[in-house]
Amino acid sequence: MQATDFKNKKVMVFGWARSGKAAAQLLTKLGSKVTVVNGGEFDAQDATYRSLLAADVTLIGTDNAETLDSTYDYLIKNPGINYDHPLVQKAEKLNIPILTEVEIALSTFNGRLIAVTGSNGKTTTTSLIRDMLKADGQNVITAGNIGVPVSEVVFDLTREDTLLLELSSFQLLGLPDIQPDIALVTNIFSNHLDYHKTRANYVAAKFRITRHQNANQYLVLNADGQDTEKFKNETEAQVLEFSRTKQHFPVAFSNGNLTLTDEIVMPTKDIKLVGPHNQENILAAVTVANLAGVSKPAIREVLKTFSGVAHRLQYLFTAGDVKYYNDSKATDIEATQTALDSFDCPTIWIGGGLERGDDLERLLPNLKNVKAVIAVGETQQKIVTLAREAGKPVIAVTDVEHAAPVAVQLASPGDVVLLSPAQASWDQYSSFEERGDNFVASLKETLNS
């Protein structure tokens, strides 16, 4: 789409989160006649609310489907709002195009576009790519699912800049025309089926990242993924692959080194990130960085110092020769399996959270290095049962704040303390970030007392 597609058009923005505000502001700059609808009243003291009112934007404090009619040209939907919402269904019935704020923003951008999607590892890999480009002296702005709406940053970019996007499957559904210069799919598992209904729908949403790429553009894929062949066969882009288990790709871990086109970048022991999943993230990031012209010294500089993204198997600190990690983002069993397998030393594991009917016994094979278990949250009793089945000592406490001092007491020099819940946080916290922050604060208070 072009920016001119929105000029003098009637556009409804559905959702008053940060992305909705950014979309409404950008649309006013593009000359659209904007209406914002929200499932609740607006805060009259909100600065964005006041500025949009001054710009003749209509703001309606209800998401009733009756607010939408055939006079609208576009519906801009918050990615988290499901397509079965009555207002969205009405837009479909009226054949009104349903977009996300990312589509509007990209219509105004003419520089290099790198887009990252996948089930796991998106944020860590995107952050690695960003830091590598910056270390190489390139001007790069990161936005999208990583926390910053694209509409907030796009007006400040020029043709010489790189826009690096992390994109969820929800966002990709509202991006009918995206055409990245470099696209990366980290991996695909069966996630968000409550939203997409089937795995096929979820995979199709991910495929949108490459659907309109051409032969001058690149698609980077995980060679170990079950959907890789489908993507390779259906894309028009040039495909590059990476693999943690195979070494015949341009970027590889080989003989104790990270190599790029058979040249040593650095010894693996000098890389700060831990875990097999982070090896995949590194391989993906280096493949993209190399395509983007990043030098080996810049790649090496980042990998020597990058310790991870907050709440994602994040190394916190070492105290009393015990290493502490915050993996609060591990909201599913697969993520915690990966975290537990990242350490070959005695581990104090803190697990549990929202009850969703998951089969936690799948974690049994991953407990071999676990020294003791601390169970929290709604699934506390399931964690206790799991630990006892594995023959591990287990202590049940109410929450991560109480788990932290227990973990400190249980740990000995050479151990790892790992918060990796394997469950969502909403039984006790508003987000995985709040859960992780509270854990870290309790750890620091305990260690400093």
From Swiss-Prot:
Q: Where in the cell is it found?
A: Cytoplasm
Q: Which reaction does it catalyse?
A: UDP-N-acetyl-alpha-D-muramoyl-L-alanine + D-glutamate + ATP = UDP-N-acetyl-alpha-D-muramoyl-L-alanyl-D-glutamate + ADP + phosphate + H(+)
Name the EC number(s). Answer: 6.3.2.9
Q: Which GO terms describe its cellular component?
A: cytoplasm
Q: Name one GO biological process term.
A: cell division
- Which EC main class describes this enzyme? ligase
Which Pfam families does UniProt cross-reference here? Mur_ligase_C (PF02875), Mur_ligase_M (PF08245)
Coiled-coil residue spans: none
Q: Provide the binding site for ATP.
A: G118, S119, N120, G121, K122, T123, T124
Write one Gene Ontology MF term. UDP-N-acetylmuramoylalanine-D-glutamate ligase activity
Keyword field: ATP-binding, Cell cycle, Cell division, Cell shape, Cell wall biogenesis/degradation, Cytoplasm, Ligase, Nucleotide-binding, Peptidoglycan synthesis
Biological or metabolic pathway of the protein: Cell wall biogenesis; peptidoglycan biosynthesis
Q: State the superkingdom.
A: Bacteria
Give the matching NCBIfam families: murD
Q: What does this protein do?
A: Cell wall formation. Catalyzes the addition of glutamate to the nucleotide precursor UDP-N-acetylmuramoyl-L-alanine (UMA).
Give the similarity note. Answer: Belongs to the MurCDEF family.
Please identify the protein, giving its name as recorded.
Answer: UDP-N-acetylmuramoylalanine--D-glutamate ligase
